[in-house]
């Protein structure tokens, strides 16, 4: 199966230019292709995964991927289908983000061997270009009429009170020139990107043909949608980042574990490197079993292993199992740090707090009276163990102090998992 056929079977092609010619070229020879990543934050998020993984798929088929980090274009920001003007970031901020994104792209691609991946930064050519050269050598090849007819530009112009600045209007010229420059430097003949990049990609194709009389191609990947209409890649806590310091491996694992049945088989095709035959077999087995599908677990394992590695996957599974177990002794200090980052609602507490106060503070009970009822009915656990009276000498006027949280409840001298019922948790972080 060719790489184009594989992408088609996974539903990963939204638009292409001359797909028959592209497929023939890919079957006849090994090519160089690229995808651009503008630094708009200090980390990539799962919305970037499709193009990153597409580069990897092409490399596995023997082609040379180029990861282009937009050190220059990131100073402006892509206006494509954005409702309003982007805020501009300082050169120092963008430079820091460039380095972060470069390091995050590295694990996905192999930078050794015959088709070693290439890392590029468009600041290398735009940083040396002056305004007159840009207007004379690049601008003359672009039609303002054609630019105004791009759907992404028309939407901004037609939106009341919006409009578009010349800075953002000129963005497609910069991205278009990236293609021409990478064609000249590295022989790139294919640009891939998200479906919102079609206008920018075709601008680069046109410019490269005009400058170098080369046939080059574009391919876009689909917008990832969820069956319930909500935005993919967002949780109540915000974006799901690839950086473990922004989204913990545990939370990352949980995100994939919670994918709806209606989406999970599509996402297995989109995001994993399991074969279509393997995915179809998983779906058939799930539908025949009549019990809880295995697909979500497989998806969560594949994605967490791919992004964070085997150790992080093991930690995510350990945390997931321990939260609902009586024995939580297997949790490491690093596991608790993940929970404190984003795994559980975390609350700072001080010595002397009792379990009733802790339940109210964390919102696991709405009042002291309700909290006492939970404690008396044995519905409250501390690190997996039932909360029990441990302070027989408490003051008569403070009956709730019969169960004080103390050193025996502190894991690593800092953490206590408070649980009410089967699924309601909070993490106490001791000052």
UniProtKB/Swiss-Prot annotation:
Catalyzes the attachment of tyrosine to tRNA(Tyr) in a two-step reaction: tyrosine is first activated by ATP to form Tyr-AMP and then transferred to the acceptor end of tRNA(Tyr). It comes from the Bacteria. A motif ('KMSKS' region) lies at residues 231-235. It is an enzyme of class 6 (ligase). Signal peptide: none annotated. It comes from Neisseria meningitidis serogroup C / serotype 2a (strain ATCC 700532 / DSM 15464 / FAM18). Its EC number is 6.1.1.1. It is found in: Cytoplasm. Keywords: Aminoacyl-tRNA synthetase, ATP-binding, Cytoplasm, Ligase, Nucleotide-binding, Protein biosynthesis, RNA-binding. A motif ('HIGH' region) lies at residues 39-48. Residues 353-422 form the S4 RNA-binding domain. Belongs to the class-I aminoacyl-tRNA synthetase family. TyrS type 1 subfamily. GO terms for cellular component: cytosol. L-tyrosine binds at residues 34, 171, 175. This is Tyrosine--tRNA ligase. ATP binds at residue 234. Pfam families: SYY_C-terminal (PF22421), tRNA-synt_1b (PF00579). GO terms for biological process: tyrosyl-tRNA aminoacylation. GO terms for molecular function: ATP binding; RNA binding; tyrosine-tRNA ligase activity. PANTHER family: TYROSINE--TRNA LIGASE, MITOCHONDRIAL, TYROSYL-TRNA SYNTHETASE. Homodimer. It catalyses: tRNA(Tyr) + L-tyrosine + ATP = L-tyrosyl-tRNA(Tyr) + AMP + diphosphate + H(+). The lineage of its organism: Bacteria, Pseudomonadati, Pseudomonadota, Betaproteobacteria, Neisseriales. PROSITE patterns: AA_TRNA_LIGASE_I (PS00178), S4 (PS50889). The gene is tyrS.
């Amino acid at each position: 199966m060719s790489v184009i056929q594989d992408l088609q079977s996974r539903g990963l092609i939204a638009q292409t230019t001359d797909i028959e010619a592209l497929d023939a070229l890919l079957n006849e020879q090994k090519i160089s292709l690229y995808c651009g990543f503008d630094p708009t934050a200090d980390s990539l998020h799962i919305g970037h995964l499709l193009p990153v993984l597409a580069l990897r798929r092409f490399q596995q088929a023997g082609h040379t991927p180029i990861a282009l980090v937009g050190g220059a274009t990131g100073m402006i920001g892509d206006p494509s289908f954005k409702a309003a003007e982007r805020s501009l970031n300082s050169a120092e901020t963008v430079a820091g983000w460039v380095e972060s994104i470069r390091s995050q792209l590295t694990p996905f691609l192999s930078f050794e061997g015959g088709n070693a991946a290439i890392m590029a930064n468009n600041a290398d050519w735009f940083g040396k270009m002056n305004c007159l050269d840009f207007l004379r050598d690049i601008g003359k090849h672009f039609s303002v009429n054609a630019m105004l007819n791009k759907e992404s530009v028309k939407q901004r112009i037609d939106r009341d009170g919006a409009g578009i600045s010349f800075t953002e209007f000129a963005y497609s010229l910069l991205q278009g020139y990236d293609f021409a420059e990478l064609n000249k430097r590295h022989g790139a003949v294919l640009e891939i990107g998200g479906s919102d990049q079609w206008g920018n990609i075709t601008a680069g194709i046109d410019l490269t043909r005009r400058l170098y009389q080369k046939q080059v191609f574009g391919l876009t990947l689909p917008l990832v949608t969820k069956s319930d209409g909500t935005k993919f890649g967002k949780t109540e806590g915000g974006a799901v980042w690839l950086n473990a310091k922004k989204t913990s491996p545990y939370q990352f694992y949980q995100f994939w574990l919670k994918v709806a049945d209606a989406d999970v088989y599509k996402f297995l095709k989109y995001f994993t490197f399991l074969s279509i035959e393997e995915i179809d077999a998983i779906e058939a087995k799930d539908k025949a079993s009549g019990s809880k599908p295995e697909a979500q677990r497989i998806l969560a394992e594949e994605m967490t292993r791919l992004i964070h590695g085997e150790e992080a996957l093991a930690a995510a599974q350990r945390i997931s199992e321990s939260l609902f177990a009586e024995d939580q002794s297997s949790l490491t200090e690093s596991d608790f740090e993940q929970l404190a980052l984003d795994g559980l609602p975390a609350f700072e507490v001080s010595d002397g707090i009792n379990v009733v106060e802790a339940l109210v503070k964390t919102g696991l009970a709405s009042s002291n009276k309700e909290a006492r009822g939970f404690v008396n009915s044995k519905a409250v656990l501390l690190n997996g163990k039932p909360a029990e009276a441990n302070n027989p000498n408490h003051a008569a006027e403070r009956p709730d102090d019969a169960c004080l949280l103390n050193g025996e409840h502190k894991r690593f001298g800092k953490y206590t998992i408070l649980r009410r019922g089967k699924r309601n948790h909070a993490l106490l972080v001791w000052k």
